[in-house]
Amino acid sequence: MMISYQELVRTFLSLEKADFLWGKGTRATTEEICRLTSPETCVAAIGQAGENLVPLSGMLNSRNHSGGAGTGAIMGSKNLKAIAVEGTKGVNIADRQEMKRLNDYMMTELIGANNNHVVPSTPQSWAEYSDPKSRWTARKGLFWGAAEGGPIETGEIPPGNQNTVGFRTYKSVFDLGPAAEKYTVKMSGCHSCPIRCMTQMNIPRVKEFGVPSTGGNTCVANFVHTTIFPNGPKDFEDKDDGRVIGNLVGLNLFDDYGLWCNYGQLHRDFTYCYSKGVFKRVLPAEEYAEIRWDQLEAGDVNFIKDFYYRLAHRVGELSHLADGSYAIAERWNLGEEYWGYAKNKLWSPFGYPVHHANEASAQVGSIVNCMFNRDCMTHTHINFIGSGLPLKLQREVAKELFGSEDAYDETKNYTPINDAKIKYAKWSLLRVCLHNAVTLCNWVWPMTVSPLKSRNYRGDLALEAKFFKAITGEEMTQEKLDLAAERIFTLHRAYTVKLMQTKDMRNEHDLICSWVFDKDPQIPVFTEGTDKMDRDDMHASLTMFYKEMGWDPQLGCPTRETLQRLGLEDIAADLAAHNLLPA
């Protein structure tokens, strides 16, 4: 059992024995390593789930930042408990004055809240528009109720003041409801990010369940844990506080064990298997009898404790739930009923769920969700969709970006595919590839729109290139960055072709579960009230997208010509050697 130490100040790398850490959770592991090194050390560690090679496991750093998709099991298979990194030098900046100017410009004119929502969720004196679904939730009368020194009001936060940007997003209340307000200490987030999207709560009662009273997370990890209760979580003192308390218990356990939820699919799979009688069918009678299903029905948080322990330590047949959706479908013979069940939200028969798919700009989100090998983790399009601006403005922006207002459909009022939607899909995918490459957050970027009426709510899509030049000193345009992103995305596609050993991406990879087409049977496709898709239209959509990318229009795999255009001649040669290039 080893720890990898990297001390960047001396560019020193060493492997150290970690026997004394094996069996510990991610939190205790991090604390021990920081005692041995420095409080400034950043530790990425696995918990018991990774040690036990649980497929749905991850590595955790900074308490709750998860690298999922089985990375924990990979580290565990190598007996690698943690990677510890310490650095003392600053980041080299070619033009600090320009960097500061761009930062001020972004902070005062462009940036919104989480997901770059640019209007508040409630009507406010400074705002022309509001949208109750916006994550710009700051308002008068909404407080960080458990803040040190007393409650702090979020208040009205008009754009322009950099020091108040961090108040705009209030994820604990957004994710968990009003009952979370009195337990919220503050919002936090990734290092140096002005958008504070991470909940930080303090709930003394949580200690009764053997976990720290403090903690937090964001998005699905914030609220998913109590969704397994068929009758909802049991309240303690106040209405809906069971959801808040139960989820803090759940996320503290989940992150400490180093489990990964597959964007909530683990919990949906549990609900499916419980409600459909699968567990009763596949679990040995003795195991089924010892599980406290009465606690589940009662919404008792103790059930979560037992459930997560079983998953992380691979106890019994139930623990195979954490093998992933594809594996349990095979192991437990779940069949088409499972894959076609709309509430289960499985996008692909490979076992990953929707992530802003058909419900997010129709064919655009659908294409995006077909392109990766797990939930797609692409927010370029959903940030634009959820900005909070009125439909008329969004369609105007879409015309400027993609050539036609028809690129942008009203949610659940879709139209057939067109060329502008294909450009929208390509833009969404290339931007996420770019952001991943230059380490920008695709949960905020790109700056497509702005909160300022004086800018007519237009953002600045060249900002990535401007920052790139200021930081590196290298001449850069957005067109060059887009080309680099296209190279990255095409390389990813080529690698998928190689790993799957097939050119036929359309029929072997870009697959969609049946419920996406069969839901809402009483509502015709392309009429108001449904976000279902049409099979023929999606076939045409993929063909058009393949052509736009320079891939084979029938197979959906990169051509030699496109690989050469992108400077990937070696990749073309490798694919050709394996008979994986189209004729």
Where are these regions (language model features)?
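Well-ordered mid-protein domain cores that form the structural environment of catalytic cofactors
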Residues: 1-40
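Extended C-terminal regions of large enzymes
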Residues: 34-583
